[in-house]
Amino acid sequence: MVRKSKKQKNSNKLFLILLPLAVVIATGVLYFSSNKFLSEANCGCGNPDSEQAGRFQENEKIAIFNGNPVRYQMAELTPVKEALKKTVLGQATDERWIEIDLSEQKLYAHNGNKIDYEFLVSSGKWAPTPTGDFRIWIKLKYTKMEGGVKGTGTYYYLPNVPYTQYFYKGYGLHGTYWHNNFGHPMSHGCVNLATPDAEKLFYWTSPAVPEGKRIIRPFQNDPGTRVVIHN
């Protein structure tokens, strides 16, 4: 029988000691990486549903906000002529940009040296609205939003959210049918607007939405409108 040297025995002991530690570290890295990916993918109020993006879902009959059922319009909204007129005649330019003042709970739609619109909003109460300089990366006439935790009073399931414009991951500007408490924080991170205000903004921003379209992304000749959010 071959005897192991003292040096070999010590090496084996060191390996056995370090192996569990390496497994723990690897597991931890995988766990936190997965959580980071999931949190980034699901942050904000929701994410566009690729299969039904922009479409009105007639089969959705129930809406829930903070654990309570709410009523909502169960018919597709028809854009007002004035909103569509702005799409055709008033193509968005680099002079148009959106300012959101979280301390005032107000949105300002700047057009050069003037302000086209000033709206009350509701920003994040149960989760903060991100601050910074962003660009609209997708616009959807309707989308579904779901989040929070069931049984804690934070769960929400909101189908057919109208006039949604995502500006950062799952954070967006959108119409609101589940409350009318604008001017006060009421969201899970998104920027809530009264639906008529959200509609005007939807057709004012870039990329322009042609009549009949329900979803659009920015492209080279028609980039997303700039969105600046500050306290």
Where do the language-model regions lie?
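Exported/periplasmic cell-wall-interacting domains
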Residues: 2-3, 7-51, 147-231
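Weak global preference for isoleucine
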Residues: 17, 25, 62-64, 98-100, ...
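N-terminal, intrinsically disordered, polar/charged segments of Gram-positive cell-envelope systems
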Residues: 36-93
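Gly/Pro-biased beta-strand-loop elements
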Residues: 70-181, 231
